[in-house]
Amino acid sequence: MLYELFLTIVFFFSSFGFNEFNEISTCNDDEVFEIFCGFQNPEDLYLSPSKRKIIVSEFGSLAPNTKFGNLVYFDLKTKKREPISINYEANQWGDDTCSLEDKRLSPHGIDLIERNDGKYMLAVVNHLPRETIELFELIETDTIELIWRGCVDAPQNKYFNDIALKKDGSFYVTSMFDSNISEWSLVSASIFISNTGEVFYWGKENGFDVLSNTSGSFPNGIDLSSDEKFLYINYWFSGLTVKFNLLE
């Protein structure tokens, strides 16, 4: 309820600044955009290793709501939305204390990387039935298949947003705000640009640590440079995207 209500308020007020917009509910292309419908709240996208498919995170909801989402892909050749099959094996990549509670999920940010062992790893910020990072091995042929390789439970009261993987299987993740924040405190933070979250680092041996000097107003998207020396972090409320030096 909190996240959905907040977005409704934000878009209501921001709509007064729109000069014009095109109606796309009929899924008709225009001179600028080719429109593809049939997706549920597409939240994040990632190009597959073959560059012939786009992995799509279909957001559901945040707890205590119970609307689940999906992981699907968009075939760039056929221009069709396709399901992704998931097989479940032992927890090898995640936290040993994390267990699979439900095969359904509510995905948010995603990231894909070729690990040091040559396997493709897909990490998914997941909000249901509890706040976790879900870790999958991705296998691409004519379709995309996933093998569940583990999960990591989020720190208490944290709502994650987006994730950036390292080749060793560790990752950085943005915490956008705490789950116990009130709706109006979040609205106030968006107006006065006050800090609501930070970036966490997770490694298999030591778990989560807050990354110093990353606190900001609604940390949102995150990406890691190919040499793993820099993070690119977006702070939604402040309208900033920063380059963060991991070596300093």
Annotate the PLM regions.
Residues I35-G38, S85-Y88, S99-D102, C151-Q156, ...:
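Surface loop/turn motifs at the tips and blade-to-blade linkers of beta-strand repeat domains
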Residues E34-N70:
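Beta-strand-rich domains and repeat architectures in extracellular enzymes and scaffolds
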Residues S48-K51, I113-G118, L165-D168, S226-D227:
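Residue-level detector of Asp-centered blade-edge/turn motifs that repeat once per structural unit
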Residues V56-G69, V124-V125, V173-S194:
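Short, conserved, GDST-rich strand-edge loop motifs in beta-rich repeat architectures
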Residues N41, K67, S106, P129, ...:
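Beta-rich catalytic cores
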Residues F18-N41, G94-D95, E145:
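A short helix->beta-strand "capping" segment at the edge of beta-propeller domains
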Residues G69-N116:
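Blade-loop segments of beta-propeller domains
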